[in-house]
From Swiss-Prot:
Name of the protein this chain belongs to: UDP-N-acetylenolpyruvoylglucosamine reductase
Domain of life (superkingdom): Bacteria
Subcellular location: Cytoplasm
Catalytic-site annotation from UniProt: R185, S234 (proton donor), E304
Enzyme class, broadest EC rank: oxidoreductase
A Pfam family recorded for this sequence: MurB_C
Known role: Cell wall formation.
GO molecular function, one term: FAD binding
Family listed: Belongs to the MurB family.
Length: 321
């Protein structure tokens, strides 16, 4: 595995002459521990927060193609490795991409940086049902669109009418629900696409019923998930016909710990940073759990948490299976 030296100051100096018209914020050597909910990870070589969609499109058109681009959202379902992220990390801000606009009696135009709880609150205010499950999803809409995030038996795919995206060259795309090719925690859109917004649809509802559904979602999270810990949410996707937490528990991995990383005692499909975990600790724990579960029940767990960046040179976690 090739290791690239992180030098954001040098990269910024190299790119700045060509990026003079960019309005967004470019910052070198950003500590990703301040960005992710796990509070782990190395440096982002260059961190870009576009002012708006036009600014993002111009940036992508201008950025040389040999510079790698990594997209991050709110950071709730993200593990950044300790060696950092070479190239440019792009994070959409709520200021430029956090709108929730009701465009018809049943539809919202929603920016990709909108937090799930804000979308649920807007739907409550508009008395549109079908969005209450977002009250229990800690991330933003961009990640929900990419992962077909869901809770309480509803997935994002059930709400999508159209998705708006930019590709690596800054070209605009309008994607239908069929174009997204959704399946469980997956869409088949090219990895270099950046979702900027989506048109979502619900149904007219009753405010009291919607509020009750949101309260039920919140109570469930508080009761069974370690929401007050430094965690990335669900670690692994559910295997077919069984919950990931069950096969993890049956393999004896509840409470399993490596360094500062632990499988939660409260919900053993949640990894937590107990205080001083590194990205290495978390990923090593996850791969250990995958190996033990496979040895116990032949279920090969697939990561739900997104792992990005490079390992430190001397601390590489081999992937099981």
């Amino acid at each position: 595995m090739n290791f690239q030296l992180i030098d954001g100051e040098a990269l910024l100096a190299q790119l700045q002459p060509a990026l003079g018209d960019i309005k967004g914020k470019l910052t070198p050597n950003v500590d990703m521990r301040k960005v992710t909910w796990f509070r782990t990870g190395g440096l982002a070589e260059l961190f870009y927060q576009p002012a708006d969609e036009a600014d993002l499109a111009l940036f992508l058109k201008t950025l040389p193609e040999f510079i790698s681009v990594t997209i991050v959202g709110i950071g709730s379902n993200l593990l950044v490795r300790d060696g950092g992220i070479p190239g440019v990390v792009i994070r959409l801000s709520a200021k430029g991409f956090g709108q929730v606009q009701q465009v018809s009696p049943k539809r919202f135009l929603v920016g990709a940086a909108t937090a799930g709880k804000h979308l649920a609150a807007a739907a409550l205010e508009a008395e549109i049902t079908g969005f209450h499950f977002y009250h229990g999803i800690p991330g933003g809409l961009g990640g929900a669109l990419k992962m077909n995030a869901g809770a309480n038996g509803i997935e994002t795919a059930a709400r999508v009418v159209e998705v708006y995206a930019l590709d690596r060259k800054g070209r605009h795309h309008i994607l239908s629900l069929a174009d997204m090719h959704y399946s469980y925690r997956h869409c088949a859109i090219p990895k270099d696409f950046i979702f900027t917004a989506a048109l979502l649809e619900g149904e007219p509802g009753n405010r009291d019923d919607i509020r009750a559904a949101m309260d039920e979602v919140a109570l469930h999270r508080e009761t069974v998930q370690p929401v007050r810990e430094k965690t990335g949410g669900s670690t692994f996707r559910n295997p077919e016909n069984i919950s990931a937490w069950r096969v993890i528990d049956e393999a004896g991995c509840r409470g399993l710990q490596i360094g500062g990383a632990q499988m939660s005692e409260m919900h053993c499909n949640f990894m937590i940073n107990t205080g001083q975990a590194t990205g290495y600790d978390l990923e090593a724990l996850g791969e250990t759990v995958r190996a033990r579960v496979f040895a116990h029940s032949a279920h090969l767990l697939q990561w739900e948490i997104q792992r990005i960046g490079q390992f430190e040179q001397s601390r590489i976690v081999p992937s099981f299976g």
